[in-house]
């Protein structure tokens, strides 16, 4: 049928737009996209499935159409933004709640009737004291529901905009809505007709001539509108006019008295509301006077019950005399009672004024913020009057209305929304809490007129007007309603119990519908999984082409169909078919894996679409992130311009000429250049010769030619080193050499003995080594660098037993090694003994010679061992003799020094002495008493020097010294063997008179005595030796004076040498 096809097309278009809104919440739909929905001829109920659009427009149709349509359009715009925010991936921080005191919300959404109902459709169903919020158990909003409601809000806002612009394709829509509203108003007026006829017999007439009889008040609707405001374009009764125009923004409006109003009943606006006389036609006795052919409009209205406190008020009253709430106030719940039982109301405050809840300051009615603390006005929780002391607040009713009150309180009435039979006064249903029109269902058996003719009842004791009186209705209807109420309360109890356990109300209701169990929560835990599996299996059997169904899809279908198994299977199949069609329209059919994606993601189309898109883009992602080298293009193509454009665009070269230069270098034969190297070089220069040199730099170590950007260069020199040589050199230096050997492999710079160059060099070398070395080698570099820094600390010590270094900050001579836990002397490096305590190192050594049998057994070898070699730079001790080469290389700090005088050895061109004659060779500057020179003396000459200065020396082994097995010198030396270096005894022949030592070690023994006693060997120099020493130290060739004899010449040279080159503390050996 055409109607069904139009409805189907409308739903398809509507679902497409909702899906687009879910995918992109910020998407703006054009008028062309919305036209299929706007041009539809379906009724409003079929076009707006969630939103009650007709009621929303009718409830706000007051005044000029353009004014209220603009107001409604603005409110819908804000509501649309609420929906889009809920659909956005980055929702606002406080998306879960909406505050009523928000100025934007209060001036737009809350200014129209039905705005809060739209928020409840979004999911804001939890009532808060100051707003609405999502339920606590709901972590995320229902995207489908939110998208559908947002689309309908958007559609209605667009329709209203088109109506205002007179461009709506169905312009008669607004007229139809307004005609329906007029018909509804007339229907409600006709419903009052029987009641009015019963109260006041006579025809119910309405004024036919405008202005002949004033209409009802625009604000309260109960009293006649006797005052007309041209600015507001509304008619108000005097009481409402006083309240409405008391606002500062409307205080300047001028009002006019409508014609046909008696001047006696007109109230001056200058009088307060409490001083205004009541209209004369409000007496209830006057309603029964048959002489009145037409009732006064004011007397055609009934006394009204307050919906909050059930107080019976007179017809002309705008606010309830008990709780100060307006006549149109909806039914409210109990509030928190104050200390006087007034529910927190303050009767001392003037009507309309309000007290700040923070500072209790009394503010004017028009004030929005407190005048003292500037905090906003908060809504007061409503309450019922429950204390007997509140009777003083209520005005005593008229004696004539007491009979009407008794009759009205004995009435029962049906709610027009839920058809519940109510017996309490007022028109707020106790079941659905909604207000109904005041149409009593049953009347008292006697008419009001007969009861009124008997005169007023006798006055009695005052009674509470707010207490409802019990009444009864028909037994069958009452029983039916009681049963419905009992079942409803039971269902509500089950739902609350389920929500406490994490089950939603739909699950509880569906469980009851499916199983009829009395314990639905237990059934959901035990039986629901099997039911869902059965639904999924039956759905798969019904249409095997749709693939397997997930339990999530079965669950949603089962809940949507309220537990009906067959309908759930149909819904599951229908939903899956629609989702497959949606994915297929997007380019993903079943052959692309759409069925499997839907199953994996529980039927979620957006997640399934994301998965399918990810699978389709996977080859592109792999190709994009592939770490392999890019294919090298061919540079021999005939289209040179195309190649130049490619270089210019892809590699961002500075100019067209640079791109042509790069292409010419790439086309040269032989082709030894890489593309990246050429591009990098061309960016720095455009000189072809310079670029060729830049692209062919030779390694200073191996001679391999590489581009300059691949070479490594140190900051200390201009040598260029290829990556392989750089990595290999520094790896070997780290693993097999000292930290000071990490210099340039080509030129050997810088000199790492200079502390000023050391810091700057290693700071830049660290960055280069991090990118070139292996992680273990780089870690070793940092370890050695740290040790080198620690060795420069003046409090650094080397253990004399295990060669472990540590920082020793104590002042005592006794130090304990943290590694081997051996104790030794800080100064002499000998193993600590109790005899050393309180003695100097020299006294302790003499004590060892005289009292230690082991020391005596070793003889002079122990003396030489104790007077071993100490590195002057790092203080590391070597228990070795000085025989052999005097050039010593410290294994710890790589310092080169003389083992006799501890002066440094200098490499080629490193000597700081400006007048040095041997600067171009490895050399050292020794004092004249150094073993370096005295080892050439004979033992007898050394003995003579000691004898001349009365120094005792040994010529025979000390008493108790043991001989070495096999004979030979027993002094320990470091000897080079095929496997490395080894410490062992000297083993050379020991001549007689040499104290059991070989000739070299006996000379070392004698020289150590000469150095210990600071003896100057120059006293035994011959003339030739004096001239050589003078030339060596003073850099001049001495000549004898004229007539100077040789002895005088020798004495003069000796005096000059000893005075100008003394043997003082400048010798490093004496400072150790």
Swiss-Prot record:
Amino-acid positions noted as binding Zn(2+) 6 in the UniProt annotation, renumbered to this chain: 898, 901, 916, 925
Effect of residue 885 to A: Abolished E3 ubiquitin-protein ligase activity and ability to promote formation of the bacterial ubiquitin coat
Residue spans, zinc finger RING-type: 699-749, 871-901
Domain UBA span(s) in chain numbering: 564-615
Pathway(s) served: Protein modification; protein ubiquitination
Binding site for Zn(2+) 5: 871, 874, 890, 893
PANTHER family named among the record's database cross-references: E3 UBIQUITIN-PROTEIN LIGASE RNF31, RING FINGER PROTEIN 31-RELATED
UniProt protein name: E3 ubiquitin-protein ligase RNF31
Species of provenance: Homo sapiens (Human)
């Amino acid at each position: 049928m055409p109607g069904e096809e139009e409805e189907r097309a409308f739903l398809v278009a509507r679902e497409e737009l909702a899906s687009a809104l879910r995918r992109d919440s910020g998407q703006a739909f054009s008028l062309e996209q919305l036209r299929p929905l706007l041009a539809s001829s379906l009724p409003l109920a079929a076009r707006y499935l969630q939103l009650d659009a007709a009621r929303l427009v009718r409830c706000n149709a007051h005044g000029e159409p353009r004014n209220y349509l603009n107001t409604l359009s603005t409110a819908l715009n804000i509501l649309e933004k609420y929906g889009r925010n809920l659909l956005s991936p980055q929702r606002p921080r406080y998306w879960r709640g909406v505050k009523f005191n928000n100025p934007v919300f209060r001036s737009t959404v809350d200014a129209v009737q039905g705005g809060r109902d739209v928020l409840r459709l979004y999911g804001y169903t939890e009532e808060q004291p100051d707003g609405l919020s999502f339920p606590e158990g709901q972590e995320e909003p229902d995207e489908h529901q939110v998208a559908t409601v947002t689309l309908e809000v958007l559609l209605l806002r667009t329709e209203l905009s088109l109506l205002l612009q007179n461009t709506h394709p169905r312009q008669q829509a607004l007229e139809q809505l307004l005609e329906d509203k007029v018909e509804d108003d007339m229907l409600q007026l006709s419903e009052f007709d029987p009641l009015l006829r019963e109260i006041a017999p006579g025809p119910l007439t309405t004024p036919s001539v405008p202005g002949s009889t004033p209409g009802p008040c625009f604000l309260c609707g109960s009293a006649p509108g006797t005052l007309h405001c041209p600015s507001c374009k509304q008619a108000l009764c005097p009481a409402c006019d006083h309240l409405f125009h008391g606002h500062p923004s409307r205080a300047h409006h001028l009002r006019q008295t409508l014609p046909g109003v008696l001047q006696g009943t007109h109230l001056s606006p200058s009088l307060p509301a409490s001083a205004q006389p009541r209209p004369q036609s409000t007496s209830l006795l006057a309603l029964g006077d048959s002489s009145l052919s037409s009732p006064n409009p004011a007397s055609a209205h009934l006394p009204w019950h307050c919906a909050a406190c059930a107080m019976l008020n007179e017809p002309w009253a705008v606010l309830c005399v008990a709780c100060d709430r307006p006549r149109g106030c909806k039914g409210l719940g109990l509030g928190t009672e104050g200390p006087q039982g007034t529910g927190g109301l303050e009767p001392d405050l003037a009507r309309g004024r309000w007290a700040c809840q923070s500072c209790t300051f009394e503010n004017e009615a028009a004030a929005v913020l407190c005048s003292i603390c500037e905090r906003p006005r908060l809504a007061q929780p409503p309450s019922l009057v429950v204390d007997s002391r509140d009777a003083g607040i209520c005005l005593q009713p008229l004696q004539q209305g007491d009979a009407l009150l008794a009759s009205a309180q004995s009435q029962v009435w049906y709610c027009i929304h839920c058809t519940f039979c109510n017996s309490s006064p007022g028109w707020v249903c106790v079941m659905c809490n909604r207000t109904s029109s005041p149409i009593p269902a049953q009347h008292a058996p006697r008419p009001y007129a007969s009861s009124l003719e008997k005169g007023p009842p006798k006055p009695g004791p005052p009674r509470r007007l707010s207490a409802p009186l019990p009444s009864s209705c028909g037994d069958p209807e009452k029983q039916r309603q009681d049963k419905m109420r009992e079942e409803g309360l039971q269902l509500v109890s089950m739902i609350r119990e389920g929500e406490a356990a994490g089950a939603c109300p739909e699950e509880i209701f569906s469980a009851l519908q499916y199983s009829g169990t009395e314990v639905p929560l237990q059934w959901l835990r035990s039986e629901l999984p099997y039911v869902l599996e059965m639904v999924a299996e039956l759905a798969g059997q019904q249409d095997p082409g749709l693939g397997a169904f997930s339990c999530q899809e079965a669950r949603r279908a089962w809940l949507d169909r309220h537990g009906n198994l067959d309908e759930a299977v149909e819904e599951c199949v229908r939903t899956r078919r629609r989702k497959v069609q949606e994915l297929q329209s997007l380019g993903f059919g079943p052959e692309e894996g759409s069925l499997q994606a839907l199953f994996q993601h529980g039927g979620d189309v957006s997640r399934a679409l994301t998965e399918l898109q990810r699978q389709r883009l996977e080859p592109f992602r792999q190709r994009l992130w592939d770490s392999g080298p890019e294919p090298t293009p061919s540079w021999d193509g005939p289209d040179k311009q195309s190649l130049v454009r490619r270089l210019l665009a892809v590699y961002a070269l500075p100019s067209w000429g640079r791109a042509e230069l790069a292409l010419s270098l790439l086309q040269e034969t032989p082709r030894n250049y890489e593309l990246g190297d050429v591009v990098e070089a061309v960016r720095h220069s455009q000189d072809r010769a310079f670029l060729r040199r830049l692209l062919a730099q030779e390694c200073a170590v191996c001679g391999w030619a590489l581009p300059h950007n691949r070479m490594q260069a140190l900051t200390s020199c201009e040598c260029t080193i290829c990556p392989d040589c750089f990595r290999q050199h520094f790896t070997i230096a780290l693993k097999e050499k000292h930290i000071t050997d990490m210099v340039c492999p080509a030129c050997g710079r810088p000199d790492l003995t200079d502390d000023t160059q050391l810091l700057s060099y290693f700071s830049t070398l660290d960055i280069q080594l991090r990118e070139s070395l292996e992680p273990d080698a780089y870690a070793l570099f940092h370890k050695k660098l740290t040790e080198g820094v620690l060795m420069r600390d003046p409090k650094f010590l080397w253990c004399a037993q295990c060669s472990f270094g540590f920082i020793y900050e104590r002042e005592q001579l006794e130090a304990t090694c943290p590694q081997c836990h051996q104790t030794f002397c800080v100064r002499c490096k000998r193993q600590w003994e109790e005899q050393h305590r309180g003695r100097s190192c020299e006294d302790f050594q003499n004590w060892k010679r005289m009292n230690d049998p082991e020391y005596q057994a070793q003889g002079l070898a122990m003396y030489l061992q104790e007077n071993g070699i100490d590195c002057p730079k790092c203080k590391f001790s070597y228990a070795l003799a000085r025989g052999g080469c005097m050039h010593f290389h410290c294994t710890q700090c790589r310092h080169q020094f003389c083992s006799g005088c501890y002066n440094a050895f200098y490499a080629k061109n490193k000597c700081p002495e400006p007048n040095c004659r041997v600067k171009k060779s490895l050399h050292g500057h020794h004092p004249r008493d150094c073993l370096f020179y005295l080892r050439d003396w004979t033992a007898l000459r050394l003995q003579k020097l000691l004898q001349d200065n009365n120094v005792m020396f040994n010529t025979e082994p000390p008493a108790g010294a043991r001989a070495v097995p096999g004979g030979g010198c027993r002094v320990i030396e470091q000897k080079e063997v095929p496997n490395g270096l080894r410490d062992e005894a000297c083993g050379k022949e020991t001549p007689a008179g040499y104290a059991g030592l070989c000739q070299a070690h006996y000379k070392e023994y004698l020289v150590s005595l000469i150095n210990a006693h600071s003896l100057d060997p120059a006293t035994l120099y011959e003339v030739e030796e004096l001239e050589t020493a003078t030339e060596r130290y003073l850099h001049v060739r001495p000549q004898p004076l004229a007539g100077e004899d040789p002895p005088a010449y020798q004495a003069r040279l000796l005096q000059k040498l000893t005075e100008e080159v003394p043997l003082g503390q400048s010798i490093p050996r004496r400072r150790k």
